[in-house]
């Protein structure tokens, strides 16, 4: 599995898991949402172990930008709220930072 695919799938799993808990606590949904939510969060953690990185902290840091961008896609697709220019600019900055962490020369 490529690093980018692992990050994308991890973001989807993390956001889905966190949203399940949000739905239970904030939207008054059934506690039955917690089962799939916790399973998604476990899948998220497993997927992050599949990225090509010698250090966990670097893998997590690079993932952060992907998470921000994916969260804004979730905002639009699942919650029906279109990200504004500030959201998009912030996501672009985060993705640029992730690229530096992920692709920067090591020595």
Curated annotation (Swiss-Prot):
The keyword Transmembrane applies. InterPro entries: UPF0060. It is a multi-pass membrane protein. The keyword Nucleotide-binding does not apply. One of its GO terms (cellular component) is plasma membrane. Its main location: membrane. The chain crosses the membrane at residues 4-24, 31-51, 59-79, 85-105. It holds the Pfam family UPF0060. It is found in: Cell inner membrane. Keywords: Cell inner membrane, Cell membrane, Membrane, Transmembrane, Transmembrane helix. Belongs to the UPF0060 family. This is UPF0060 membrane protein M446_5886. It comes from Methylobacterium sp. (strain 4-46). The lineage of its organism: Bacteria, Pseudomonadati, Pseudomonadota, Alphaproteobacteria, Hyphomicrobiales.
């Amino acid at each position: 599995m490529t690093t980018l695919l692992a990050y994308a799938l991890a973001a989807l799993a993390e956001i889905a898991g966190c949203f399940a808990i949000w739905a239970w606590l904030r939207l008054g949904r059934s506690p039955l949402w917690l089962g799939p939510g916790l399973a998604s969060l476990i899948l998220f953690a497993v997927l992050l172990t599949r990225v090509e990185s010698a250090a966990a902290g670097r893998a997590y840091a690079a993932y952060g930008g992907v998470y921000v961008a994916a969260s804004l896609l979730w905002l639009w697709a699942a919650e029906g709220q279109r990200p504004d220019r500030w959201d998009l600019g912030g996501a672009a900055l985060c993705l640029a930072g992730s690229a530096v962490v992920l692709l920067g020369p090591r020595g």
